[in-house]
Amino acid sequence: MSLLTAFDTTGKSVVSKAVSKLKEFGVEYEVHVMSAHRTPDAAIKFSAEAKKNGFGVIIAAAGMAAHLAGVLAAKTTLPVIGIPCKSAQLDGMDALLATVMMPTGIPVATVAVDGAANAAILAVEMLALSDDSLAEKLENMKADMEKGVAEKDKAMQAKVAEL
């Protein structure tokens, strides 16, 4: 099972967080630079062929007008996850609104501004619906997070007891 990560050049630094998470789960991926505005034909072709090329999910990171995820979603039946990226203007709010406000029939699952790690985890959750080993890795990740919180709580209780 594979995953396609596509992004506009504004999302390059953000995407490294998604790549790290995908590697952590052992998910195959490709990374490409494309733009909804500067290379629309290439983006549309890429998206239209993604499923037949073996991809299971598309992650698209873009800033400012952030139309990449929507353009990709328009030409595929694969799930598309959008990562709105911060830019010098509006601190990423423009990208967030552009990514989340999609017309009926062209959904884009949207994570937080610069939320690449969660985008990767969401993609893994989608892929895990048909992959038991990924599902087990997700369960282990959540169990580890739970242990971490329990350890922090124990440390806090010890500090409070000393007051």
Predicted features, each with a name:
Residues 89-136:
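Short, glycine-/small-residue-rich phosphate/pyrophosphate-handling segment
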Residues 19-24, 44-47, 91-103:
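Active-site-proximal loop->helix
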Residues 127-163:
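Glycine-rich phosphate/pyrophosphate-binding loop and the adjoining helix
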Residues 21-24, 70-79, 102, 128:
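Alpha-helix C-terminal capping segments
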